[in-house]
Design a protein with these regions (language model features):
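C-terminal alpha-helical cap/extension of soluble enzyme domains
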Residues: 134-136, 146-218
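Alpha/beta enzyme core
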Residues: 2-116, 127-132, 136-144, 148, ...
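Short catalytic/ligand-gating loop segments at beta-alpha or beta-beta junctions
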Residues: 119-124
Length: 218
C-alpha cells in the first residue's frame, strides 16, 4: 500500500509508480490511493475528505501500474467520521451520517471495469461499544461511523477490500475498561487482555459473516 493521495495528482503518480516498479520486481502487489480521506492514518493528517474524481482513475491506473485502487466516496478515518452538523438525527436523537457516494463508485466501475477497488476508513462505530466505553469511564462524544447496510452494498460491487480498524480499537478498549472497573485490584494483563481479545474476535467474526460476506472465501 502506498498512499500518495495527500500529494498533488502528478506527484501521487510519480511516488506510486516508484513503489510499483520496485515491488513488482519481487512479485508484490501494490495498492494505490486516489482521493483524500479525512482523519489521521500513519501520521498523515487530512482535515477534510476529497472525493475521488472518476475521470482520473483510468489515467492513474495506467501510469502507475497499481494492482488495486483505494478511493474516496465518503468514508474517513477514526471514530468521529463526521461532524454533527454533517449528520441528521433520527427520532431517538442518534446521529445519522450522510450516505456514501455510490454514484462515484459506479462511475469508477464503468471506467475501469473489473479492477479491484478498496475502501479505507469503513468502521461502523457500533453504538453499543461507544456506550460501553463511556459507561466505564470513557469520554467519546458524537462518535459516528459508516452504516453497515452501506458496507454490505459496497461489498457486492467491485470493492474487493474494506478496511475496518477503529471498530477493533473500540472493542478492545471497551473490554479492557469494563474488566478493570469490574476488577479494580487486577494487575495481570492476561486477565483484561483476554476479554479484549475475545470481544475483538467476535466483532470481526460478525463483520466477516454478516457485513462483508467474505466468510469461506479465504
Amino acid at each position: 500500500m502506498i498512499d500518495g493521495s495527500h500529494h498533488p495528482y502528478q506527484k501521487n503518480i510519480e511516488e506510486t509508480r516508484k513503489v510499483v516498479e520496485y515491488a513488482h520486481k519481487y512479485d508484490v502487489t501494490v495498492e494505490g490511493e486516489l482521493g483524500v480521506l479525512a482523519g489521521i492514518e500513519d501520521d498523515v493528517v487530512a482535515a477534510k475528505s476529497v472525493y475521488t474524481q472518476p475521470e482520473e482513475v483510468e489515467d492513474f491506473v495506467k501510469k502507475t501500474g497499481v494492482d488495486s485502487l483505494a478511493i474516496s466516496i465518503g468514508t474517513s478515518h477514526g471514530a468521529n467520521k463526521f461532524k454533527p452538523e454533517q449528520c441528521t438525527k433520527n427520532s431517538e436523537g442518534v446521529l445519522i451520517p450522510p450516505p456514501l457516494r455510490f454514484d462515484i463508485l459506479e462511475e469508477i466501475e464503468r471506467r475501469i471495469p473489473g479492477f479491484p477497488i478498496v475502501l479505507h476508513g469503513a468502521s461502523s462505530v457500533p453504538a453499543e461499544l461507544v456506550k460501553m466505553i463511556n459507561t466505564y469511564g470513557g469520554k467519546m462524544k458524537d462518535a459516528v461511523g459508516i452504516p453497515e447496510e452501506q458496507l454490505r452494498k459496497a461489498a457486492k460491487s467491485a470493492v474487493c477490500k474494506i478496511n475496518i480498524d477503529s471498530d477493533g480499537r473500540l472493542a478492545m478498549t471497551a473490554a479492557v475498561r469494563k474488566a478493570l472497573v469490574d476488577n479494580p485490584a487486577e494487575f495481570d494483563p492476561r486477565k483484561y487482555l483476554g476479554p479484549a481479545r475475545d470481544l475483538l474476535k467476535e466483532l470481526y467474526k460478525l463483520k466477516i459473516i454478516n457485513v462483508l460476506g467474505s466468510n469461506n472465501k479465504g
